Amino acid sequence: MNNVLYIAAGGAIGAVLRYSISILALQLFGTGFPFGTLIVNVAGSFLMGCIYALAELSHIGPEWKALIGVGLLGALTTFSTFSNETLLLLQQGELVKASLNVLLNLILCLTVVYLGQQLIYSRV
């Protein structure tokens, strides 16, 4: 039951962060491309790589993994919004933007989760 509370607390923080970052990205970049979602997914993926490497090395306990990895980063990152925004771009005839959105999210997120892990492993 304790993990549920950690996850809920982390989720509340992650959801507010996601909302705040999305609003800021809209103000900075406008509505032409879903930069807010890209930013939260890339940042969250990097942090996820760090958290899971720390957990694997036993430098953080399961409660921190639940709080940050499942709760905070689970609420911060968003596959459903990414999918919906990509579909909307396709429906608007924006094939290049939709393709770019898919490629950037997949390539950048996979790259930074790896880099996050390597950062932690290199410090040990």
Swiss-Prot record:
Function statement: Fluoride-specific ion channel. Important for reducing fluoride concentration in the cell, thus reducing its toxicity.
Organism this protein belongs to: Shewanella amazonensis (strain ATCC BAA-1098 / SB2B)
Organism superkingdom: Bacteria
Catalytic reactions on record: fluoride(in) = fluoride(out)
Membrane topology of this protein: Multi-pass membrane protein
Family listed: Belongs to the fluoride channel Fluc/FEX (TC 1.A.43) family.
Alphabetized Pfam families for the sequence: CRCB
Entry's localization field: Cell inner membrane
Keyword Nucleotidyltransferase in record: no
GO cellular component annotations of the record: plasma membrane
UniProt name for this protein: Fluoride-specific ion channel FluC
Stored HAMAP family: FluC
